[in-house]
UniProtKB/Swiss-Prot annotation:
Immunoglobulin-binding region C repeats by residue range: 270-327
Sequence repeat spans: 333-340, 341-348, 349-356, 357-364, 365-372, 373-380, 381-388, 389-396, 397-405, 406-413, 414-421, 422-429
Immunoglobulin-binding region A repeat spans: 154-211
Identification of the protein by name: Immunoglobulin G-binding protein A
Region (Disordered): 318-424, 459-479
Chain location of the short sequence motif LPXTG sorting signal per the record: 474-478
Subunit structure, interactors included: Interacts with host TNFRSF1A; this interaction leads to the stimulation of both surface expression and shedding of TNFRSF1A.
Sequence positions bearing Pentaglycyl murein peptidoglycan amidated threonine: T477
Immunoglobulin-binding region B repeat intervals: 212-269
Positions of the LysM domain: 413-457
GO cellular component, one term: extracellular region
Amino acid sequence: MKKKNIYSIRKLGVGIASVTLGTLLISGGVTPAANAAQHDEAQQNAFYQVLNMPNLNADQRNGFIQSLKDDPSQSANVLGEAQKLNDSQAPKADAQQNKFNKDQQSAFYEILNMPNLNEEQRNGFIQSLKDDPSQSTNVLGEAKKLNESQAPKADNNFNKEQQNAFYEILNMPNLNEEQRNGFIQSLKDDPSQSANLLAEAKKLNESQAPKADNKFNKEQQNAFYEILHLPNLNEEQRNGFIQSLKDDPSQSANLLAEAKKLNDAQAPKADNKFNKEQQNAFYEILHLPNLTEEQRNGFIQSLKDDPSVSKEILAEAKKLNDAQAPKEEDNNKPGKEDGNKPGKEDGNKPGKEDNKKPGKEDGNKPGKEDNKKPGKEDGNKPGKEDGNKPGKEDGNKPGKEDGNKPGKEDGNGVHVVKPGDTVNDIAKANGTTADKIAADNKLADKNMIKPGQELVVDKKQPANHADANKAQALPETGEENPFIGTTVFGGLSLALGAALLAGRRREL
């Protein structure tokens, strides 16, 4: 019964289909049933692809197939959605099969071959490339930078300037290990600063160099040598100048000049370099026997203070030396200074040898000098000089010089200071006091007087002073009158002359 029903239905279906087909042929159209029966190629293709998408689950696959059945006209859209969902659900391991673009592939290859990245760093960069291929260039740049920063120190590739700096710093002898390593690390961190780092390293190396190893330029070396040999600098001064030379060699000339100036200022007085005229005066004054130490030192100090007046100072010193010379050293008897008294050696004393007979001089009789009586000189009585009384000089009282007696007034209450005079000497010679003279002349310091200065003196010389000078005019032999001695010598000379004359007559 059941089979009959099925058969009847089939027959009915065939009949209906036949009628429909006939109708379509007559009317020239296609019925919806015929359209649904004939799936186009797009639907079939979509149906096939959806069935083979590995990443869709059963529900997703059945849903897409049902949609294809429900509306075959949407086959292309349904297939696109199915592919998108399938790709999004693809396993990670399968993502390596993605076709990377050219930049991504290059970055991927370079990162895999970077030797200084560890596995974690390398995998991180590769994952970044997979996640966003559009950032391949940036990811590769970061990977390179990290790879270079982690490169072993010995493997760093320095450019030419960096290599030169690296080599020089390694061979700087005055840097310690910490300083050397610091400069090398700075070179690695920023090679572009190689020149600046090398300059700093050189400066530090030179500043720490041992003193004997410093390389001075020619001017600096000369200054260094001269300062070391300046004898009047102490150690502190010498070391100070040498340190200044090291700190700033450009100032070598100025520093040497300062050092020389200080050396000269500290030179011992005896070592001063006087010019020729000054040296001569210095030598002569040192050997003037009649100067006191105070006078000698005063003249020497004057020479040092003003070498240009060396001649004048020497003349004053000689004059003072002569004035203070002992009487016996003036070739005069005590109290005289003209070499005219008998007993002198000026070709006037009887018995002298001037290619003349004994006792005679210049055709004069024995005992006479220049047609004058024995004991006289130039028409003066014995003991006189130039028409002056015995012991006088140039019309002055005994013991005077140049018309002024040392320590005595000029007869008008004024004393002219001579070289070597002191206020005390002047006061003593004039019977007054130094304080009185200082007060009368308003002297700020009674020890400060100079040759040629005029001083007012109130008191005259004591009367007994002239008598003492007269006594000094006598010869040191104790004779009261030189005329007797002269007469004796004259008589002997006459006798000797007569004997010689008689002998010559006999020969004739």
